[in-house]
């Protein structure tokens, strides 16, 4: 009786798959059909292997699937999953060939709802940045030497102990004021803002620390509220925010004048060690000494240069005497030449008169006129030269050292007769001679003082 069923013995061998080939084909199909995907569920059967890999089951009310997260990915997770945690995983759907089971190969894991929180974080950050709350030009510099530091945190927080320990170590002279507030939980954001506003209103401190230790994103969420950011920006005191660990960033960090990676780092930024104070003061003092020395050196050089240009009174008198002698010689020469010329002209006219007797009266008149002119010229020239001579004599008299002494000045000379011109040439208990207008005196030096201008 014929049948429509194929005969198994007649199926070509080339169309038969091995189990391994089947699993490989299914694995490729799964990977192509399901790229990296976010999947939400509850963790159960969590195991952390000695190799560092994580094995767990991800389930919901109706189904479950096995998952693995290898050590290379697990080490970057900021929390350790626990039984019953609600999480979201980013994973590839793969097939574990040895057992033929499909599973999730997890690339990243986060607590459930973190995605929504992160979106809210980005939206608020963009809004406040657009308003200019994060503008670097708005941020205030920290005081160079803070005497009082305010702390906004929980009295029970480990961060407070870290801050106080750091302040005691670095700057025990600094006064610390605590503005207590819850740092997580319902209503914490409003209370944090109130504590910051209180510190600003009291104006008791030079800088304000807003801090808490590390935790999950939910634990730190109070510092991502808009009211906290706006209160920080409106605070009249420079604010340092140190929340969580170095990798944690909150809205408060962006609003602060300075962001510190940890509470301890915030305390270090706020408190300048006393040794650093002293070092800075020493540096400033050294700079002032060097500047003063340079100024004194420049003044001394200028004084030395001016002293070399200054001519002594005796040299000035000698120079004026030589000039006076020169003028006297020129005056005598100037009077002799016109007189000789006049005498020559007179003799010439006399000869002409003698040869021309009929014109004697005319010649006499000419001679008289020439004589008159000659006399006037000689008187004018002589008066001018005498006036210059009197002026030079008056100048010479003004430079006479005796006249200077008569005006109340004195000339001081040492034991060797050298004139003393500067205080540096004198020493206490030295005997000197003081020359006055009408005599001299021997005196002893009690002390020497210099006048700096």
UniProtKB/Swiss-Prot annotation:
E.C. code: 3.1.11.6
Pfam families from the UniProt entry: Exonuc_VII_L, tRNA_anti_2
One GO cellular component, as annotated: cytoplasm
One MF term in the entry's GO annotations: exodeoxyribonuclease VII activity
Cellular compartment(s): Cytoplasm
Principal subcellular localization: cytoplasm
Catalytic activity field: Exonucleolytic cleavage in either 5'- to 3'- or 3'- to 5'-direction to yield nucleoside 5'-phosphates
Highest taxon in the source lineage: Bacteria
Keywords, in A-Z order: Cytoplasm, Exonuclease, Hydrolase, Nuclease
CDD domains for this protein: ExoVII_LU_OBF
InterPro entries recorded: Exonuc_VII_L, Exonuc_VII_lsu_C, OB-fold_nuc-bd_dom
Gene Ontology biological process terms, A to Z: DNA catabolic process
Binding partners and assembly: Heterooligomer composed of large and small subunits.
Biological function: Bidirectionally degrades single-stranded DNA into large acid-insoluble oligonucleotides, which are then degraded further into small acid-soluble oligonucleotides.
Family the UniProt entry places it in: Belongs to the XseA family.
Protein name: Exodeoxyribonuclease 7 large subunit
Lineage: Bacteria, Pseudomonadati, Pseudomonadota, Betaproteobacteria, Burkholderiales
Gene name of this polypeptide: xseA
């Amino acid at each position: 009786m014929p049948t429509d069923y194929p005969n198994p013995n007649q199926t070509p061998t080339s169309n038969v798959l091995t189990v391994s080939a089947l699993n490989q084909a299914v694995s490729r199909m799964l990977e192509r059909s399901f790229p990296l995907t976010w999947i939400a569920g509850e963790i159960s059967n969590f195991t952390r292997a000695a190799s560092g890999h994580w094995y767990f089951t991800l389930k919901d009310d109706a189904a479950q699937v096995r998952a693995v997260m290898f050590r290379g990915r697990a080490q970057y997770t900021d929390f350790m999953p626990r039984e019953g945690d609600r999480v979201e995983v980013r994973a590839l759907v793969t097939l574990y060939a040895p057992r033929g089971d499909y599973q999730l190969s997890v690339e990243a894991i986060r607590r459930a709802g973190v995605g929504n929180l992160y979106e809210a974080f980005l939206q608020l950050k963009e809004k406040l940045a657009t308003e200019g709350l994060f503008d670097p030009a708005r941020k205030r510099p920290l005081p160079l030497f803070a005497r009082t530091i305010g702390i906004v945190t929980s009295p029970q927080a480990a961060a407070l102990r870290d801050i106080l320990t750091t302040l005691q170590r670095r700057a025990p002279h600094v006064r610390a004021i605590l503005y207590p507030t819850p740092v997580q939980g319902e209503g914490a954001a409003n209370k944090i803002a109130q504590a910051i506003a209180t510190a600003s209103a009291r104006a008791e401190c030079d800088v304000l620390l807003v801090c808490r230790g590390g935790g999950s994103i939910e634990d730190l969420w109070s510092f991502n509220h808009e009211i906290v950011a706006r209160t920080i920006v409106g605070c009249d005191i420079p604010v340092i925010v140190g929340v969580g660990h170095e990798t944690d960033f909150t809205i408060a960090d962006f609003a602060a004048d300075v962001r510190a990676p940890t509470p301890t780092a915030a305390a270090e930024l706020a408190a300048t060690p006393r040794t650093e104070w002293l070092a800075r003061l020493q540096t400033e003092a050294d700079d002032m000494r060097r500047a003063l020395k340079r100024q004194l050196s420049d003044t001394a050089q200028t004084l030395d240069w001016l002293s070399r240009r200054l001519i002594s009174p005796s040299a000035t008198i000698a120079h004026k005497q030589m000039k006076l002698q020169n003028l006297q010689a020129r005056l005598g020469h100037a009077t002799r030449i016109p007189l000789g010329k006049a005498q020559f002209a007179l003799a010439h006219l006399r000869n002409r008169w003698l040869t021309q007797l009929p014109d004697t009266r005319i010649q006499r008149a000419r001679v008289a006129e020439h004589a008159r002119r000659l006399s006037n010229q000689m008187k004018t020239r002589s008066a001018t030269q005498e006036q210059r001579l009197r002026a030079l004599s008056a100048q010479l008299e003004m430079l006479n050292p005796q006249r200077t002494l008569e005006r109340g000045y004195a000339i001081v000379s040492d034991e060797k007769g050298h004139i003393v011109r500067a205080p540096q040439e004198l020493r206490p208990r030295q005997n000197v001679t003081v020359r006055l207008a009408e005599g001299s005196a021997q005196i002893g030096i009690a002390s020497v003082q210099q006048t700096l201008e």
